[in-house]
Amino acid sequence: MKKKVTIVTIILFLLVIVGSFGKVTDFIINLEWFKEIGYTSVYFTKLAAILKLMIPIFIIIYTGLWFYYKSIRKIIIKWNKVVEVNVKTEKLKKRVAIVIDVIASFFVAYFTSSVYWYRILQFTSGNSFNIKDPIFNLDVSFYVFRLPLIESLYGVMLLFLIFMAVLTVILYIVLSLRDRVYNRNIGGINISFKEFFKGLSDFAGRQFAIISGLIMFLVAVGYAIRSFNLVYSPRGVVYGGGYTDIHVSLVFYVIIIAAAIVSSVVIFTSIIKYKIKPIFVSIVAILILIIGQSITAEIVQNLIVKSNEKNLEAPYIKNNIEYTRKAFNIDKLSESNFPSSDSLTQADIDSNRDTVNNIKVNSVTPALEFYNQVQVVRYYYDFRDLDVDRYNIGGKYSEVFLAPREIDSKSLEGNADTWQNRHLIYTHGYGLVMSKVNSVTSEGQPNFVIKDIPPQNSTNLKITNPRIYYGEETDDYAIANNTLGEFDYPDGSKNKTNNYDGKGGIKANILNRLIFAINKRDSNFLLSENITSNSKILINRNIMDRLNKIAPFLSYDKDPYVVLSGGKLFWIVDAYTTSDRFPYSQPYNNVNYIRNSVKVVIDAVDGTTNFYIVDKNDPIANSYSKIFPGLFKDVSQVPKDIRSHFKYPEDLFSTQCNVLGKYHVTDTGVFYNSEDLWETAKNQKQINGEKGVNDASYFIMRLPGENKSEMVLMEYFNMKDKDNMSAIFGARMDGNNYGKLILYKLPTDKTVYSPYLFKQKLNQDPSISKEVSLWNTQGSSVQFGDTSIIPIKNSLLYVEPVYLRAQGKNSMPEVKRVIVSFGNKMVMANSIDEALNQIFNNSSNNQSETRTETGGTSTDSSNNKDKLKQAQDLYNQAVDAQKNGDWSKYGDYINKLGKTLDELNK
């Protein structure tokens, strides 16, 4: 028998060991990986924090349960009137109780610590915001760093005490039922409440008194927490405590807190003394206060506040405006009135050439489509996204589109989808493609300055190692520097290969190969002859997965962008510190505080990942730096060239746009009346297409009043539910101006065209609409590009690229014209310079004036007939060229047709 028990024990032990292999290998691999990237301290900080929280919780829970068990055990022995205790049985019960206690305490402690480990670190390391809340005059750090942990521990303790109370009652009921079965004359279930209470008091009066008293004390703690949470109240006209919350609810909460503390003492003593009435009175009093608070608050809100809302809520509206603007970092933006006059001259254009020369004629979506059509080279390459950035090219500060050519191993299909191909051969992407935003080829396509494999580079930018081992599409592990050779790029009928020499990766020694084989359940790690001791196992290669594994407490921008610096590629990811605990701040997407305090730079070759704090005034980022020493570097350590590519992130800007639509108003009366609401401007991409939200765009421009051009992220605002433009919002990002926000408020006494109204205006222009309609015939379609509305001096210049796309699966949109508008003048030309020349130097020939002269000339009828026939012939020739795919001839015919139609209009 003993032998059988030993065998069973051994088998169970082996099963536990085998079952834990996965967790053990996970731990070893994580440890090796954190060591490889230099962040072992970060990994152990979390483990240490979990243990620091877990050990005291385990001790408290274990001790509480053990003393509870011992006291209840004595009561049960006494209850059962046991004269002589069986020592062996008692020892067994004690061992079972210890095992259950240990297991229960471990799970409670582990769950609590693994969920709330970060909150205790914030509690002890939180920095002051130096901002006081307007109700309790507490620093905001109390709400952001300390209150969350207090709430968490309160919830755990309340659940634990309720569990203990319920367990005590259940034990009493079970024993009572058992005794009734044996007809013992004691209080049971079908008896009066008074008898039940006395029986429970006899059974475990002291234990139940302590538990009940503590529960009532926690009721007081709960209402204290609820008082602090009034700064997040949604009751009034704005988010945060309003008139009713402060003058009614808070008063009741204070009374309930005092009553609950008194009741906890009353309940404790009453249970000991077998008195029901004081307990009943205490509980009823608390319930009356709770119900009374709710009813009184509703009465005051509906009968008093609503009829005097504007005056009574004014101070709380002011709080909401002030704290929301602070939380979303729009309280220090630079506001100015922009006249949007029609006073722009050719001299103004000439003095702002750096702005004009960087106006986009390319647009993001069609450019990315073209990149993926002509530059992927092989089917397993992919351009996931198009990034916008600025580079000094040939001595000129230029805005460019660029995209990294990543390898997508998921595209390997059929016989090509093998373990060797996925993990040993196709290990990395190669190179990037770059084009200037301000120029296109004669066919209307992006004009590449870097293209092809190996890179054909017509810029002064150095490219020495453009490989991409870490990126947005590298979702699988790779075993680099193997004997097969890693595919680099196609070279005619052969392939160039590369052997990885980066410092990233875990060494593929026999022990690590064994660990990975167990962890991945893949024997290839051990059996492959192509893996050597010099090979490197690259894991967590997807840059977003990588960041979330290193620093999951940060939020990350959804659009990482690639930078060419020092001949290599680097990824820059914007990281955010966020909170939903900022007092009086209106939440947007479940966040009511956000800062772009951290920039992350990742080497695309070796995966080196550096976190830089760029906002030293952010208390949350500073607390992270204290919690994780060694993780964050100072912004002064960023290489100068990399830093010059830092951009203001679109996700943050979009959030600030949403907030600014309402919170640009600081007057409480105007805010209450919703008199001046804005919304992000709408736009239209196709003729008769649906109206959609206009996307924010990056521009290189010289802002009015500035001496130097710079990159600015800009968005346009309309009046709510109207198409008249009301403001232009911008974020600066070059040099010391990084992060400065500007707001140009437009005149309210005249119509300023929004992107959508501008589209309607050009659609109503006879000459432009005629030509666009002609293009938009069967066999092709017209699409609009990104609308640019550029402030120059005191005026607005509108620019719209016009794309033409032929029907067909592989057709690509091509820029055929550029529409430029200023004031009441609008022209469509082959280039921006040509359009500006027509507007400012040849106003007698511009299309706006042509429109006013239409029908005002006297011409010979036969001459008109010749012109009409010529127009018809040109149209037919254009259609034929279009069908043949000869877009160059098509453009020539359309140009001639336009001139002929202009002559007919004279």
From Swiss-Prot:
Keyword Membrane found: yes
Domain of life: Bacteria
Keywords linked to the UniProt accession: Cell membrane, Membrane, Transmembrane, Transmembrane helix
Sequence segments annotated as region (Disordered): 842-875
Pfam entry (one): UPF0182
Membrane topology, as annotated: Multi-pass membrane protein
Subcellular location: Cell membrane
Transmembrane segments: 7-29, 47-69, 96-118, 153-175, 208-230, 250-272, 279-301
Biased composition annotated in UniProt, kind: Low complexity: 842-862
Principal subcellular localization: membrane
GO cellular component: extracellular region; plasma membrane
Family, as annotated: Belongs to the UPF0182 family.
Protein name: UPF0182 protein CA_C0010
